[in-house]
């Protein structure tokens, strides 16, 4: 199991039966593959779906917000973008799982643009992180060049300020509580010294710090 799969598997443990969930593009879409037995969620997509189905149900005439072919489950609803964003902005999404370029110790998120690169816009990320009841960021702990992505202060353009509730990487789980960043779990095979060495942000260590089970 590679790093992204481990991250997706751990995030899936946070979702509750009956949740309405928005999964962002890329790594977050993998979360649906690791839902625990007995946990059923309803997937929402910004382009107007409630009740997305697994990849195996993909239809050539349907695409999700990332432009990928998708399917829908029995009872699904389809609507325009105005209704979709009313659901998001109205606080009706229980959890969103998004990727990240940078997260900092103040729960700020940068995940939509790398300076100097042309992008068509932020998409629905800003709405999701401000409107969802729980914001989970799923990303690899360091950049491809080994540099830190978990910083004292984000250096890339922000998506939202003080919006992240939980950050999951292949090395650790952090939670943002009462204005502080807390390390609550370390991955199986990792140790506190490694997490500190690869994390620029300052964080507190939970008294009941857990080590993730390898079989989760």
Curated annotation (Swiss-Prot):
It comes from the Bacteria. One of its GO terms (molecular function) is butyrate-acetoacetate CoA-transferase activity. The keyword Transferase applies. The active site is at residue 46. Induction: Transcriptionally regulated by the regulatory protein AtoC. Transmembrane segments: none annotated. Belongs to the 3-oxoacid CoA-transferase subunit B family. NCBIfam families: pcaJ_scoB_fam (TIGR02428). This is Acetate CoA-transferase subunit beta. It comes from Escherichia coli (strain K12). The gene is atoA.
